[in-house]
Amino acid sequence: MKLLFSIALIYVSYFAVAQQETVKKDTVNKLQEVVISASRVKESILKSPVDIQVLTAKDIKLTPSLSFFDALENVQGLQVITPSLGFKVFNARGFSNTTNVRFAQLVDGMDVASPHIGGAIGNSLAPNDLDIEKVEILPGMASALYGMNTVNGLVNMITKSPFTSQGLSIQQNTALTHFSDTESDVKLYTETSFRYAKALSSKFAFKINAALTHGYDWIAGDYTDLNPKANSSNGLYGNENPAYDGINSYGNESSNRKTILLGGKNYVIARTGYNEKDLADNTLKNIKADAKLFYKFNEKSMLSYSYRFATLDNIYQRANRFKLEDYFVQQHGLQFENKSITAKVYINNESTGKSYNLRSMGENIDRNFKKDADWYNDFKTGFNTATANGSAIPEALNQARQFADNGRYQPGTAAFNSVLGKLQDINNWDIGAALRVKQSFVQSEAQVDLTEEYFSFLKKSGIRILTGIDNRTYVIMPDGNYFINPKDADQNSNFTYGKTGGFVSVTKKLLEEKLSLNAVLRVDKSDYFDAKLNPRASIVFSPNNRQNFRASIQSGYRFPSIFEAFSNVNSGGVKRVGGLPVMSSGIFENAYLQTSIANFQSAVLNDINNNSLSQTQAIEKNKTLLKKNHYSYLTPEKVKSIEIGYKGLFLQNHLYIDTDFYFSQYKGFIAQTNMNVANTQNEAEIPAYLYDNSKQSKYRMYTNSKSSIKTYGFSLGLTYNFLEGFTAKANTTYSKLENIENKDGLEDGFNTPNWMVNASLSKENLFKNIDATIGYKWQNSYYWQSFLANGNVDSFTNINAQIAYKITTLDTKIK
């Protein structure tokens, strides 16, 4: 069991401006609560046409979590996974993964995604706790209004204004981690944050924020064998399996295995590999900062410029595990807004610094010590010597490995560190491990509320018209390993990949504004693809201002990210190639599915070892097991969703109820599959070439699943205020993968627990100047699928508590 003990020291200077509350005590403040993310205009949260959740400043103040980012784990309908310390990924309604490209993360309406990944790098560009006004969460499709990568929803983090929240604030979080950790001593975790904001006049203001986080990540130490049956035909399992491939051991994967003839039988042999803890320093050191300037032309018009950046030293997970070192990401943003117009342009840029791929590092340290051909020859020699001396097969295999590994680089030695440093700078994963990516995108968008000023006469008819347009252009800079220019003779020249979209939203109020009808039509056009329509229709019925029923139906598309479209990565003998025709022409047409090749090779091996067939005879017998690839080039994903919901207040506004139900259908999931191409034009030779790993080219291709997938779920949240300031909250979320039609094995993992439950009890001023909260979280076990590993995630229960004491004379709070 891992324990986390924390002490948070929060200092807020006397310059901070307190916000006045005029809500009656002990009532749930929902009648006055306004949100903007659901419809891109200000509206009551009770009358939102789709599910929206809010984490308020009060929620953040009372959370028993370490930060507002951690507190989001308790939001109704939101799933949060933690691939590493300081790295959290949001998702809703299924199909979670560590680089979620279906769920957007915004700060003041600007997407903070990493350009080359298509999703946010954890909370790297998120505000610190001191600058958060509130967080709005859409746990469901938002494509009609936002496009982008929002088929599963979005989080919009809204920061404080320096006109209304001024002064200096400092926060220090300190924790002890790694209790009862056999891989590490107890470690110190610290996070230091500050915010300074000042209005220099009624027109000009600025703010500056920064945070420094330092800690030590938990060591990934799962050594479960991913290839336990490789030598089952020889009766070798467990520790005797010479093709061992541990989850967090790198250099012994499929591309580092070979079938060799030993003593008259064929054995699958893998190189030895290195454990993750030997390849990466798990020290976490993240720095982030932002600044924003504001100029008001008048009370209705304002121009602002923002800049935020982060540098990361952290562990990061995709299909492989990475060590991020000197990773740099930044955003410049310019925004103008008045009563009817909002326009913004922002640029996201990233550089991966000296980051590296842990798998490639492990396998290429091995190859720097000894080339594969030499190592396998030495293995044969060692095996033959051992058997000649009378050793049994398992012992002979062990002695053969020791002989072949003699002189191998040992972790912690100067020689090992030297070769690791050398490979860290080689940007080719066939011979090195460097991750050297520099990518950018430019996003420009504008929206106009036509009825606010230009067609204000429509207001009398209860009509509101909102229209918007946006463009995102990626500037892709080939690095020789991750990306190449597929259309230019110079494959290292920069190129672009863009998408343009626009929407019109019309809302009509009827029955004395008790009934609200809304229709949204969005059109998106991306390079390489035809235009796609994303419509949404919704209805909200409010018999009174405390009871609100809603229903909506919508569809959306997700276009491939630049990595899915244009990647060209040499990854340890397997080339990962983007799914556009300009990248992968000829591969889909000539490839065989790797799963069928594995079955074919296993059957041939069994017939050679157990049925006395020659290799040629065994290949001929089993060649029908080989399956030609039937996947093709990328097309956009499509999702259709129906949602109904209810928000209401009861017991004189003391009780708030929020519930929703949804049903979604997905088609054309963008996913990866492995396929190999035999290195021969002679069709008769293909089976023999596909039995020999050295005579085939291995690919991991981005393509679309042929499955049609249906999911449904619901959530229920309750908030009850009572007894002079007590607040009790509880919510539950149910998510279900209902059916997969035309199942082809290429579906993304659902990777979502069926049940999540959160509850809390809090009290402001439990005693004089003392706030207290206790929180509870439970989720059931679920099955996780990814290219790194598959397996069960155990159910877990968390109980968190906090007591905060305010020292009024020092304007200081100890939590």
Model feature map: region roles:
Residues 20-59:
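Short, acidic, small-residue-rich periplasmic hinge/interaction motif at the N-terminus
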Residues 44, 52, 69-114, 133-134:
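Extracytoplasmic beta-strand/coil segments of soluble accessory domains associated
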Residues 112-141:
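Short acidic/polar hinge/loop motifs at secondary-structure boundaries
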Residues 130-133, 139, 144-228, 285-289:
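Outer-membrane beta-barrel translocator/receptor signature
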Residues 197-203, 209-215, 284, 328-332, ...:
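Conserved C-terminal beta-signal and adjacent last beta-strands/turns
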Residues 286-330, 466-479, 493-540, 718-734:
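Surface-exposed extracellular loop regions of Gram-negative outer-membrane beta-barrel proteins
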Residues 468-470, 509-511, 651, 656-786:
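Gram-negative outer-membrane beta-barrel transporters
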Residues 582-697:
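Membrane-embedded beta-barrel scaffold of Gram-negative outer-membrane proteins
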